[in-house]
Structures are given as structure tokens and as C-alpha cells.
Design a protein with these regions (language model features):
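Transmembrane alpha-helices
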Residues: 24, 109-112, 116, 120, ...
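Interhelical loop and adjacent transmembrane-helix boundary motif
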Residues: 1-7, 171-211
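C-terminal transmembrane helix and the adjacent membrane-cytosol boundary/short C-terminal tail
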Residues: 44, 106, 110-124, 128-129, ...
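Periplasmic/extracellular loop-to-transmembrane helix junction in inner-membrane transport proteins
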Residues: 1-24, 36-45, 82-86, 188-197
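Transmembrane-helix boundary motif in ABC transporter permease subunits
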Residues: 21-52, 65-67, 115-117, 122-123, ...
Length: 230
């Protein structure tokens, strides 16, 4: 199979950076959305929940096209970000991170939401009765008790980001050194006669990274589970 080339190491580094940035940027919003869905009832909640989980059921190409329309240089959001803040997503690695974040966001929200919903609300009520503000109760009780779900959701989203293909190639294309992540590079190598060995090497790396992420999620969840379950 041979050793990895410098270009292949660069592809791996770019993929890790894209996946890491996507989860770091989406985690605070995912925690907020999960908390709202788990603890509040409001008109339109079912619709809001459906919209959050829409990337799970939509073809990734549709998600990528929607991102291109919204965040492209001439899109309503992308144009403002470019002119006012100099932020460009289309055909940049930051766009790949955005696509990964959008595709992994439902997984993160779902894991955190289930973890929050499993917490006995009497604990939160007792803390509020003793004078704790909602923010204090969330930070000192709800968030620590939901940490296993946060870890699971984060690592699942990270693994999803490593494997993202359809939305990424539609939104930011397949530019070597800029947006060519692991799945896109594997696809590229399979299209050339001499690329089978490189495709195999990168496929093995992708499998290993995904297994490490899942194993780490399981191990950390057991370590921080406040119930002490093994």
C-alpha cells in the first residue's frame, strides 16, 4: 500500500481542521437548541425541531446547494459577510467547515437533547427554589449532568464532518489544498488509473479516524457519566 505522501498528509490535516472547526463553532448553539427543545414548549416547536433535523433526511447535495445560494459571494448572507467583515465561505476551507457543521448539527443536538431530557427536573426545580437563577442552574446542574450527551454529540458530529462529501463538493468544490478533504480526495483518486493505492491509503485513514472518534466517545462517556454506570 505504501507510505503516505506529503500531499496526503496535507489532506488529512485539512480534514481534521475542517471537522474540528465545525464542531467547536457549532457546539454552543447546539447546546442552546438542545436545551430549548428539551425544556420548553412553544408554538411551532415541532416545525423548529423538524428544521433542525432536516439535514439528516435531505440529500447532502441539496444542503450544499442551499449553502451556496445563501453563503455564496452573491448570496444574501454571503454578500453581507464579505462586504462588512471580509468573511468568505464559498470555495474556501471555511465553507467546508460550514458544510460539515450543518450536516453534523442534528446529530449533536439530538445527543445533547436526549441527555438533558433524561435529567430529573426536580433537581433543577429544587435549585431554583433555593434562589438559583436559570442560568446558574443550567451551568451548575444541567450542563454537568448532560456532559455524556455533549461528548457523544460532539464526537459523532466530528466523525460526520470527516466523512462529509455531497454538501462539501457542491458548496466549495474540490480544490486541492483548499477544500479537498478526505472523502473528496478519495473520490478524485478513484477517477484516475494510478490512484487506487492512494485511495486505499486514505480510505484506511478515514476508517481509523472514525473508529478512534467513536471509541473515544464511548470511553469518555463512561468516564464522566455522573451515575457511575459502566
Amino acid at each position: 500500500m505504501g507510505a503516505l505522501t506529503l500531499d496526503e498528509w496535507g489532506i488529512i490535516a485539512l480534514s481534521l481542521r475542517v471537522a474540528l472547526v465545525s464542531v467547536v463553532c457549532s457546539l454552543p448553539l447546539a447546546i442552546l437548541v438542545a436545551y430549548v427543545l428539551a425544556r420548553f414548549s412553544f408554538p411551532g416547536k415541532m416545525l423548529f425541531d423538524a428544521i433542525i433535523h432536516l439535514p439528516l433526511v435531505l440529500p447532502p447535495v441539496v444542503v450544499g446547494f442551499a449553502l451556496l445560494v445563501l453563503f455564496g459571494k452573491q448570496g444574501p448572507i454571503g454578500k453581507v459577510l464579505d462586504q462588512w467583515f471580509g468573511i468568505v465561505f464559498a470555495f474556501r476551507w471555511t465553507g467546508a467547515a460550514l458544510a460539515s457543521a450543518v450536516m453534523g448539527f442534528p446529530l449533536m443536538v439530538r445527543a445533547i437533547r436526549l441527555s438533558i431530557a433524561a435529567i430529573d427536573q426536580r433537581l433543577e426545580t429544587a435549585a431554583r427554589t433555593l434562589g438559583g437563577s436559570r442560568a446558574w442552574v443550567f451551568a451548575s446542574i444541567t450542563l454537568p449532568l448532560s456532559l455524556p450527551g455533549v461528548i457523544t454529540g460532539t464526537l459523532l458530529s466530528f466523525a460526520r464532518g470527516l466523512g462529509e462529501f455531497g454538501a462539501t463538493i457542491t458548496f466549495v468544490s474540490n480544490i486541492p489544498g483548499e477544500t479537498q478533504t478526505l472523502p473528496l480526495a478519495i473520490y478524485t483518486f478513484t477517477q484516475v488509473p494510478s490512484g487506487d493505492a492512494a485511495a486505499l491509503r486514505l480510505s484506511v485513514i478515514a476508517v481509523v479516524l472514525s473508529l478512534v472518534a467513536l471509541a473515544t466517545s464511548e470511553w469518555l462517556t463512561r468516564r464522566v457519566d455522573p451515575t457511575g454506570r459502566q
